Design a protein with these regions (language model features):
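Structural signature of cysteine-dependent C-C bond-forming condensing enzymes
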Residues: 1, 86-104, 115-130, 147-155, ...
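Condensing-enzyme catalytic core mediating Claisen C-C bond formation in acyl metabolism
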Residues: 3-7, 30, 34, 212-287
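Conserved beta-ketoacyl condensing-enzyme motif
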Residues: 6, 27-160, 189-198
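Short polar catalytic/cofactor-binding loops
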Residues: 9-16
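Short Gly/aromatic-enriched secondary-structure transition segments
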Residues: 18-29
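Active-site-adjacent elements of ketosynthase-type condensing enzymes
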Residues: 41-51, 108-112, 191-217, 259-279
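Active-site-proximal alpha-helical scaffold in enzymes
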Residues: 76-89, 141-142, 146-190, 228-249
Length: 287
């Protein structure tokens, strides 16, 4: 089996529009949670979210292409291009048909879906955009990454709710470890801070509904009351070790195992004894 390392990374997050600013914010303990600005929250039970602030795609996506992308896809294309730059692949010779792209998203283009359903309802089917479907389906995110960077290896999407991004990285890891590819771009993206998205999660009592941003995301506290909806994207460049060494790439880390499970307990709640999480960790350690 091949050894797999990380040679590039990119991020668009609620605490930074790029990798460096995100990393510095994390080190200094900055809080990305604040009041909703992406829509009028006056009818909402929930008022705190973690939005990507002052997002500017212009350095990575041309205006015409961006108009055909949902916000979640804009995030991942920017993050993927940051990862590409960080990896040094732009100055290396490599086979673009040997690059796999695998991106996870739990919901996909919810902003596009909401906008187009509103058009259908108010103005009729003739006003629905021809880009409605190709902008909203989850696999458009890896597709745009492949097209923007010219990668011709397998291009796949993972949809496993909150585990989508992690599963994408694990799937990419295994494809390199087992010798199918030398390079993979893997990660996740989400942009579900819309009125419909927040309403749906709030009505199933999944979201925190208080107004104290410093006590909103406290998953291990006895007073926890739900999660905070965020958005953004993170992409890693995974590479076979010898391939990375041959081009003198900077190596950030090595991935040595990955595990999955399903507790088969409930559609939203995890097993109270953590059986699924335990099994996944055990499988990762033994992988």
């Amino acid at each position: 089996m091949k050894r797999v390392v990380i040679t590039g990374l990119g991020a668009v997050s609620p605490v930074g529009n790029d990798t460096d600013s995100t990393w510095e914010a994390l080190k200094s303990g900055q809080n990305g949670i604040d009041k909703i600005t992406l829509f009028d929250p006056s009818r909402s039970k929930v008022h705190l979210v973690a939005e990507v602030k002052n997002f500017d795609y212009s350095g990575y996506i041309d205006a015409k292409s961006a108009k055909r992308m949902d916000r979640f896809t804009q995030f991942v294309v920017c993050a993927a291009k940051m990862a590409y730059e960080a990896s040094g692949l732009g100055t290396s010779a490599f086979d673009r048909s040997d690059v796999r792209v695998v991106i996870g998203s739990g919901i996909g283009g919810l902003q596009t879906i909401q906008e187009q359903i509103e058009k259908l309802t108010l103005k009729g089917p003739g006003k629905v955009s021809p880009f409605f479907i190709p902008s909203s389906i989850v696999n458009i995110a890896p597709a745009h990454v492949s097209m923007e960077l010219g990668f011709q290896g397998p291009c796949t999407a993972i949809v496993t709710a909150c585990a989508s991004g992690t599963d994408a990285v694990g799937d990419a890891f295994r494809s390199i470890r087992d010798g199918y590819h030398s390079i993979a771009f893997a990660g996740g993206c989400e942009a579900a801070i819309t009125e419909s998205g927040i309403a749906g999660f709030a009505n199933m009592t999944a979201l925190h509904s208080g107004d104290d941003r410093n006590r909103a995301s406290i998953p291990f506290d006895k007073d926890r009351s739900g999660f905070v909806m965020g958005e953004g994207s993170g992409v890693l460049v995974l590479e076979e070790l010898e391939h990375a060494l041959a081009r003198n790439a900077k190596i950030y880390a090595e991935i040595t195992g990955y595990g999955q499970s399903c507790d088969a307990y409930h559609i939203t709640s995890p097993d109270p004894e953590g059986k699924g999480a335990i099994k996944a960790m055990q499988r990762a350690l033994s992988d």
